[in-house]
Amino acid sequence: MKIIFTPSIKLFSCVHISALIFFFIFGYEGYLHYLFITLGYIAQTYFEFASHYYLFHGPFWKFHQKHHVEPSNDTHLLVPFAYSIPLGITIHTGYYYFLPLKTTFSFMTGHGLSYLFFEYIHYISHKRPKHFVYILKIPFVKALLLAHKKHHYKNGKMLKDKNDNFKNYGFTTLYWDKIYDTYE
């Protein structure tokens, strides 16, 4: 599949899938493992929403605006490694500091899976690769892609100014936007 061979996705996938395998092997066994995977997944969906809403449409707008001006540009499409690697290390260290080791491993499995899903959904929403046509037909994915399209466009007009009325900050879920009343 072509998407796997783009440089960013390939490196991201190798690094994070290796970590996910490690976390999965050394995490809890049984139902606690799946509970903490689920909680890690949910935590990442909130982090994704909150960082987009509070940071990228706030103090980091000038950096993020490049993506709104050229949404399909590979340079601005995925979270840059200069941001994601230090942030990932900080998050992993924070979980390790506050949670028992096995909990951290399980939690980070869910967190990592959610982050991979986020990167792929965001890539698919802007690139629409032909080999992913079957994914584009799944109702849940269609709803996510429509919501993200509304984040970038309103009435056919591209939203690229900080004062534009942005909505739909989540990528992999709609529920945080519904809770914060930013869903359209």
Task: State the predicted function of each range.
Residues 1-12, 65-79, 98-104, 111-184:
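Cytosolic/stromal cytosol-facing helical appendages immediately following the last transmembrane segment
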Residues 1-31:
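Metal-centered catalytic cores of metalloenzymes
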Residues 11-23, 77-96, 170-171:
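Core segments of transmembrane alpha-helices
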Residues 19-37, 93-106:
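Helix-coil boundary and interhelical linker segments in multi-pass alpha-helical membrane proteins
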Residues 23-30, 48-55, 78-88, 105-114, ...:
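Phosphate-binding glycine-rich loops and adjacent basic patches that engage nucleotide phosphates
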Residues 36-39, 61:
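Short amphipathic alpha-helical segments
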Residues 39-56, 109-128:
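Transmembrane alpha-helical segments that form the membrane-embedded catalytic/substrate-channel core
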Residues 49-70:
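Membrane-helix interface/capping segments
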